[in-house]
A protein has these predicted regions:
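Sequence/structural signature of beta-propeller modules
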Residues: 1-140
Length: 142
């Protein structure tokens, strides 16, 4: 099973500045650390991949998780994580760190619901966030 991370922002002006390098880094990291569970294989099949779509909405107090949506032709199981967004807040390191923490925590919640092991991820949460924020190539300049 591979894990893929992408972003979709349907609401104009409501988005986080993470780019394709961020998506690739997180996809590679999750694919290396997460193994399919028997529950996932029983529900969808061992050949299915897991997709996380990051998005944002104004007016949310906490993340909103939608899914799963199953794409049988592509053999994908997709979840969308809508993060809280506030246009009045600067996209500084604190804001981005909070968004990443909420995103990763939501992903871990989904993985745990699917009986996938997340101990390595949970233990490395701060280091993963620091790695992303420390690499300017993963964040588009405003």
């Amino acid at each position: 099973m591979s894990v893929h991370v992408s972003q979709i922002y349907p609401e104009a002006g409501v988005s986080y500045p993470f780019n394709h390098r961020f998506q690739k880094y997180l996809s590679d990291l999750l694919s290396a650390k997460v193994r399919t569970s028997q529950k996932f294989a029983d529900l969808y099949g061992p050949e299915y991949d897991l997709i996380f779509r990051m998005s944002a909405k104004e007016g949310l107090a906490r993340p909103e998780i939608k899914g799963p949506t199953v794409f049988k032709r592509d053999k994908d199981v997709e979840y969308t994580v809508f993060l809280p967004f506030d246009r009045s807040v600067d996209m500084d390191a604190n804001t981005l760190s909070r968004a990443l923490d909420l995103l990763l925590s939501s992903m871990i919640e989904i993985l745990e619901e699917l009986d996938m092991t997340t101990t390595g991820l949970s233990a490395e949460l701060s280091a993963i966030i620091d790695r992303i924020l420390g690499d300017a190539k993963m964040i588009d300049a405003s």
